[in-house]
Amino acid sequence: MTPRRLILDVVAPRGVPSTARASTSARASCVVSAVPRACPHFPACSGCVTALDAVDALDPPVLEAVREYFGDDAHETFRGRATRWRCKAKLAARAETSSGRVALGLFKRGTHELAPTETCPVSHVGVERAAATTRATCDALGVTPYDESTGEGELRYVQTVMCSDEAVDPGMDEDARAAISLVFNANTLTRRHEEICMDIARRGGDFVRGVSVNLQDARSNVIFNHAGWVHVYGEYMTFLRTPSGQRVYYLPGSFMQANPEAYGELLRRMPRHVPRGSRVVEMFSGVGAIGFSLLTNVELDVRSVRFVESSSSVAEAWERTRDELPNDSLKSRVSLQIAKAEKIAVESTRDCDVLVVDPPRKGLDESLRRVLTDSTLSDDLATILYVSCGFDSFKRDADELVASGMWTLTHHESFVFFPATNHIEVFAVFKRSKTIGRKRNG
């Protein structure tokens, strides 16, 4: 299929020339379908807090607080596409009001009433195609939607992850393929579940990369049962690429950034702050996208990367990424430790020049903050790269690091990972002070 040559839907937010924004999309090797910025589901759907056609759709309200905190007019914010950026989507399966058939979408704001959103301007066109294919199967086989009030019904959620064999950013590949996961209201895989999966695969053809099942019969709002994954068809794992093109693999239940354009830009910028030949530790690593990105940057020539992650479920994907590294030298430089970051903070900061932290929304644990601000901290550690998805917790952590006198904030910028929401990712660099709190650990 020849990609259609269509103009990207790019919005220039306040104070940013449209020409500057256009350069972002010009780097892409593929194209995506043009879509209208206005969304018919807004404001009922809870996915966005700002209309996509608003002038400030790419300036989340929290950005004003970010700029005020840093007090620096030079604070830079990366804004990518306003539409078609989402390459991973989880849609609830509930009953269509008129027919009772399966409908897919997000919940209306402040409720658990479904707003059908199978067409969504922020989602990759493949997400819409996967939703339509899944619904066709549900209609043909009489699949019943989950009913929260009774706990009955078969299908609870559908997850779609877009994966491109060609592009670094799947959002720029109209021919990206879909990995579809079905969350069934059951605790055992049945032949019917398999028939539903295989019907989706048959209808989707080459478009469907793989189909998996998650068995979740708990009466709760938790979407996935992390012990309930079953691979049924095709490829089990998906992947994103590092800026160098190296594949980093993900399981269906792995945490994965939904906006590969913005995440890829973060990965491209981080190496600027890593000295050549560094020993790197990545805490809260997940499957290791940041660490593997630094490892495969030939200009950095990092000596080692240690990945620290609390969940053992990442090991299978991490090992596949390691095994596909291009040579034994790179493979020998990586290691994975399954442990809570705060439990091994002291040992992790020894023989470490650069510490990467990408914590959950709550930020760094108090005990980890104590280690990083204690005068006995290993003299090896000279740089902290902090990726934050929760600005309030970042402010607390940054204030403590700087107040200790041991760390200086030397760089800060932000990234809009979720356009039209009140969410911002902050990337900050802290350098070790040379005159306070330096003590050689023997």
Residue ranges and their predicted role:
Residues 28-64, 83-84:
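Cysteine-cluster motifs in flexible loop/terminal segments that predominantly coordinate metals
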Residues 83-87, 100, 174-177, 422-423:
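A short, glycine/Asx- and small/polar-enriched loop/turn
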Residues 73-96, 155, 161-164:
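Composition-driven low-complexity segments enriched in polar/acidic and proline residues
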Residues 1-17:
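N-terminal chloroplast transit peptides
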Residues 160, 169-186, 247-251:
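Short, aliphatic-rich beta-strand segments
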Residues 28, 188-442:
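Rossmann-like S-adenosyl-L-methionine
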Residues 114-157, 162-163, 184-212, 219:
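Internal alpha/beta scaffold segment
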Residues 43-46, 102-121:
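Residues forming anionic-ligand binding surfaces in small-molecule and nucleic-acid pockets
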